[in-house]
């Protein structure tokens, strides 16, 4: 969201980004747009979503605005109602197929609630964008909404000076269900370099328990949430990146994770799940080793082969930096600004 808000602010729009304040929240840095965090007593579950959406509704209700953008389904209800009350333009920024995430689709009662919200609201968000064409096609199929594709890709820096690579494997991003930690962490028993995990999420405690059960506390290192500059440096130092998802949930199958491009811009080859969007990009640019099987054995084999094949690693790393010249935020920003220009002038 920082990239989108910065681009809009630099184009002359007055932008306010609203989120939640948590005990583990990193302090806000000065940005060219306004930032607001809402405090909630509850931190998870139904009580949290009810409280956050209520607080968000009343906050938005008393703000002046010409348009409102809901970021994923968990903030769409207050955005929908406020836009109706104020009679303003509403936009949907869908990072994923929310209802098809494993933590949603495997819980029938929770799934029914979120699907009801989706059916009630999304058809009214006729303007929007998402991260890839398959997800855009799903929204058009389900609700007749024709959303643009804007990928959350890193800014291209032609003058960046990358630090020397260190032989460690990096996972960065949400530590959530269905990211294959159950097989990735045990795989490290058979890989002679450390795994560094940067981020937090609903699977963090389970991931730490898996690490302890496998006796890998010295090899699997949890860094938690890092400041953007710290995470960028950590990524640039990494030798191999990880982009894995469990098969089954359609949200995973149609995903396009931000970290895929973060690794790419840092010249870091990655082990990546062989799903359609990643396959299409890799067929064109060859920046990753794709795996069909996310078992511990398969992950360990892919990691060791890339660790031991210096020529292949160098080829993939070089391809990453070459691909970054065309796969970058400067190109995506043009599409974003065109959408907002059409809506607001």
Label the predicted regions.
Residues 235-253, 268:
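Acidic donor-binding loop of glycosyltransferase active sites
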Residues 6, 54-62, 77, 81-85, ...:
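Membrane-proximal helix-turn-helix segments that form the acceptor-binding/catalytic region
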Residues 298, 305, 312-326, 338:
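A short, well-ordered alpha-helix in the C-terminal region of glycosyltransferases
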Residues 47-54, 89, 98-120, 156, ...:
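Nucleotide-sugar donor phosphate/pyrophosphate-binding loop at the beta->alpha transition
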Residues 284-296, 305-310:
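Conserved acidic donor-binding segment of nucleotide-sugar-dependent glycosyltransferases
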Residues 129, 161-196, 317, 336:
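Conserved donor-binding/catalytic core segment of Leloir-type glycosyltransferases
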Residues 208-233, 240:
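Nucleotide-activated donor-binding/catalytic signature segment of Leloir-type glycosyltransferases, i.e.
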Residues 16-19, 115-160, 220-223:
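Donor nucleotide-sugar binding/catalytic pocket of nucleotide-sugar-dependent glycosyltransferases
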């Amino acid at each position: 969201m920082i990239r989108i808000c910065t681009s809009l602010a630099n184009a002359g729009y007055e932008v306010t980004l609203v989120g939640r304040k948590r005990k583990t929240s990193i302090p806000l840095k000065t940005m060219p747009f306004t930032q607001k965090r809402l405090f909630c007593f509850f931190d998870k579950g139904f009580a949290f979503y009810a409280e956050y959406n209520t607080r968000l509704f009343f906050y938005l209700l008393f703000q002046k605005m010409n348009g409102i953008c809901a970021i994923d389904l968990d903030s769409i209800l207050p955005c929908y109602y406020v836009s109706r009350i104020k009679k303003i333009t509403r936009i949907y920024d869908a990072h994923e197929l929310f209802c098809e995430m494993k933590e949603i689709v495997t819980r029938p009662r929770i799934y029914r609630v979120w699907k009801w919200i989706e059916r009630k609201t999304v058809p009214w968000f006729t303007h929007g964008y998402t991260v890839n064409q398959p997800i855009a096609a799903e929204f058009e199929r389900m609700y007749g909404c024709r959303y643009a594709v804007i990928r959350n890709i890193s800014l291209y820096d032609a003058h960046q000076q990358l630090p020397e690579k260190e032989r460690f494997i990096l996972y960065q991003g949400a530590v959530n269900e269905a990211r294959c930690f159950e097989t990735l962490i045990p795989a490290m028993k058979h890989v002679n370099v450390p795994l560094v995990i940067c981020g937090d999420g609903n699977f963090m405690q389970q991931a730490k328990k898996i690490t302890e059960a496998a006796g890998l506390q010295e090899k699997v290192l949890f860094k938690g949430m890092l400041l953007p500059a710290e995470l960028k440096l950590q990524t640039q130092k990494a030798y191999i990146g990880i982009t894995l998802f469990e098969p089954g949930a359609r949200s995973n199958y149609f995903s396009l994770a931000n970290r895929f491009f973060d690794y790419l811009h840092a010249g870091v080859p990655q082990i990546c799940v062989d799903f359609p969007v990643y396959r299409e990009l890799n067929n064109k640019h060859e920046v990753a080793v794709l795996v069909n099987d996310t078992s511990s054995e398969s992950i360990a084999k892919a990691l060791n082969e890339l660790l031991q094949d210096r020529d292949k690693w160098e080829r993939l790393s070089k391809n990453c930096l070459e691909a970054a010249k065309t796969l970058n935020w400067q190109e995506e920003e043009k599409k974003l600004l065109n959408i907002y220009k059409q809506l607001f002038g």
